[in-house]
Amino acid sequence: MLREQNFDVIIVGGGHAGTEAALACSRMKKKTLLLTQNINTIGALSCNPAIGGIGKSHLVKEVDALGGIMAKAIDKSGIQFRILNSKKGFAVRSTRAQADRKLYSQTIKKTLLFQENLLVLQAEVDDVIVSNYKIMGVITQTKIKFFSKAVVLTTGTFLGGKIYIGSKCFLGGRINDYSSINLAQRLKDLPIKIGRLKTGTPPRINKHTINFSKLDVQYSDNPLPIFSFMGNQKEHPRQIPCYITATNEKTHEIVRKNLKKSPIYSGLITGIGPRYCPSIEDKIVRFSDRNAHQIFLEPEGLHDIEIYPNGISTSLPEDVQVEMIHSIKGLERAQITRPGYAVEYDYCDPRTLKLTLESKFIEGFFLAGQINGTTGYEEAAAQGLLAGLNASLYASNKCGWFPNRGQAYLGVLIDDLCTKGTKEPYRMFTARAEHRLILREDNADLRLTNIAKSMNLIDNSRWTRYVEKLSNIKNETTRLENLKIRSKLYSITELNNFFSIKINTESTAKDLLKRPEINYSTLMLFKKFSPGIKDKEAYEQIEIQEKYCGYIKRQIKAIKNQLNNDYIVLSKIKNYKVVKGLSNEVVSKLNFYKPYSLGQASRISGITPAAISILLIYLKKKLYST
């Protein structure tokens, strides 16, 4: 029986942000409550059945390094694994995996239900309890009150959600799931700026009605990639391929002819959709010079008959969707199992949040995921973990933590959101990170595991693996440095012939890794340099450090310069009118955004270098006068 109870932290929502937040809090030994509308949809992949991709996989690996569940779950449910940008540099290489929807959700759900310190309840939250601008708890639809020191709100697309299919409109945050109307109205009464965004999904297709013989096939990579730093290939289920087709002029003509029937173009939807995942209607209007748009036919699971046609998200009427699908090669007789639709929902301006994802105006109230204006499972999971760990720290009366832009893609994500805000669904890309050579997906554990350990976010097995990897890197680096290439020890002619290179001066085996044609594996083929280590993750780090040594040093220097301003805290300035010389516009923006540091202030639109100089002078005067 549900009754009033007290908790350290309450999580509202069981999506990717909510599950990571709940697990982070419970691992940090906090009495945690997760409230979700439907226990059966915990960890559901609401849109495409995939995890990772360009920039997104970096977030997944960082979540994993901080003890999160997403990478482990996809390793156990991924049915096609690939490395994107594999022919490019390590900084932009990204892992992506197709997921078996049911397996993925089951893995997440099982982890939560067996997690110590965590109670999962099925209940809809209608209200939050706020007293003197401090969060006190939540109230469910059935009027039960749950009290806590902190609340993490992760409502996804359910806050005031409306679903559109052609001219039809009905309430929902996902097809067949109710939207949160009362909670949406309650948030409008709080000091939170609310906006509207839109997302969408394509129709699903019965795989038995597709002519795959006409289509290109895309298989998993060999060897199979792994997401979690604690994972292995044996965890992967059976692998199956995806297929590729494309729209054509006939498809485009059908869409153009029916544009007025799309709620996006009829004026029914006012929310802005994702720029980097546009609907097929938007693609055909915005890219009118293109005569085809690629479509990836992605299986929804090993034993699922449904196919997800990635690339044709739409909210056109159902009859138009059928006509459109039948115009595409291989889908001439395809049967739609459920139509595509658009969802319009409320989001909160993330500029009203601290970098810890706590509200600047309501103490102990944290927001994470799509409610902050992002799109994507990975962005949500990363925010959820950060909000969860900070809610736990808050509940313990400890200072919050957040990574900087030179420390993690998560740092880039929250700095972009909380400093610049967003007017459209925000998606992570490697291009958003100015220090991406440092922030590779392969070294996320080296960047963040020790921090996770300090906050009790990880178990002993992960820490042991981390220490072992560091030791392997250090010892093997030292060994390669000590393998001197001198004429007395090695025949330089022998080396030159073996590697097809020209060495004229004395060097080391480690120096040879700087050459583009030599990697660690080929280096170990030279008997006098072998045997090497078997730890692939460790020797890849050695190789990367050598090949990009000069670039990495320059980026580290740039990060240090940037951090100089990020370490100058502004939180003691309550009203910027006291700083003489600032324009009214600058004062207004600084008072509204309340930047944490001088570095964050410098990244706010409209804050000039001159204003930053004035602030720096003011702070120095205050320092010397005390």
From Swiss-Prot:
NAD(+) binds at residues 273-287. Its cofactor is FAD. It is found in: Cytoplasm. The keyword NAD applies. GO terms for cellular component: cytosol. One of its GO terms (molecular function) is flavin adenine dinucleotide binding. Keywords: Cytoplasm, FAD, Flavoprotein, NAD, tRNA processing. InterPro entries: FAD/NAD-bd_sf, GIDA_C_N, MnmG, MnmG-rel, MnmG-rel_CS, MnmG_C, MnmG_C_subdom, MnmG_C_subdom_sf. It holds the Pfam family GIDA_C_1st. FAD binds at residues 13-18, 125, 180, 370. GO terms for biological process: tRNA methylation; tRNA wobble uridine modification. Transmembrane segments: none annotated. Belongs to the MnmG family. Homodimer. Heterotetramer of two MnmE and two MnmG subunits. HAMAP family: MnmG_GidA (MF_00129). NAD-binding protein involved in the addition of a carboxymethylaminomethyl (cmnm) group at the wobble position (U34) of certain tRNAs, forming tRNA-cmnm(5)s(2)U34. This is tRNA uridine 5-carboxymethylaminomethyl modification enzyme MnmG. It comes from Buchnera aphidicola subsp. Baizongia pistaciae (strain Bp).
